[in-house]
């Protein structure tokens, strides 16, 4: 929505799925199907602002059925940081836990409470035992979010790294769609 506003793409509209789907990627496809069925009658072109998001290719199968495109990549982290940069990050430390601006802001609700760590602290060691580093991929320069991300890393017992990515390849992908 921010990129649409910044670029004056007034002919584009956005619909959002519930953010809690980050914790249950197996439910994303069903939610997309419902939204696509409703949108087909209203819009001549539809573009999905998701990467694969942990669905194991199921989003792609659904989108083939509806003849709809999506953002390239396996994760939003990949299109925010850029494909090559994301590959380098993973090569440097495969045990990286990524946060975006949205996930920093929603961490307590989506992760801490959503994964029940607040009531079962023993889950922290189970969920995060293979992670070594928290990488915050910032879309906007925001010192408060950087501080919050650093505090989250400390809370999780992880090293902290900040990388300003802006909107990365997301802007290019949307631009290509918006100008077609």
Where are these regions (language model features)?
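Gly/Ser/Thr-rich loops at beta-strand to alpha-helix junctions
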Residues: 1, 21-22, 49-59, 77-79, ...
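A conserved mid-domain beta-alpha-beta active-site/ligand-binding segment of alpha/beta enzyme cores
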Residues: 90-145, 150
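N-terminal basic/disordered segments at the start of proteins
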Residues: 1-8
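C-terminal, charge/polar-rich interaction regions
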Residues: 138-180
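Short, well-structured alpha-helical segments in soluble
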Residues: 31-42
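Structural alpha-beta junctions
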Residues: 8-12, 41-42, 65-71, 151-164
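Long, charge-dense
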Residues: 58-110
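A short beta-strand-loop structural module common to alpha/beta enzyme folds
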Residues: 10-29, 162-166
């Amino acid at each position: 929505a921010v990129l649409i506003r910044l670029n004056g793409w007034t002919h584009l509209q956005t619909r959002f799925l519930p953010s809690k789907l980050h914790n249950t990627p197996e439910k994303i496809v069903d939610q997309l199907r419902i939204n696509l069925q409703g949108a087909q009658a209203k819009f001549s072109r539809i573009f999905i602002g998701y990467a694969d998001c942990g669905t194991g290719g199921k989003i792609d199968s659904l989108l083939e059925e509806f003849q709809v495109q999506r953002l390239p990549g396996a994760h939003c982290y990949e299109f925010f940081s850029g494909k090559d940069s994301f590959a380098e990050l993973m090569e440097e430390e495969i045990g990286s836990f990524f946060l975006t601006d949205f996930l920093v802001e929603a961490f307590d609700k989506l992760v801490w409470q959503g994964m029940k760590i607040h009531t079962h602290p023993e889950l922290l060691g189970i969920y995060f035992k293979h992670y070594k580093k928290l990488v915050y991929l910032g879309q906007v320069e925001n010192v408060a979010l950087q501080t919050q991300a650093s505090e989250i890393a400390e809370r999780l017992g992880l090293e902290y790294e900040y990388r300003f990515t802006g909107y990365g390849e997301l802007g290019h992908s949307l631009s290509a769609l918006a100008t077609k």
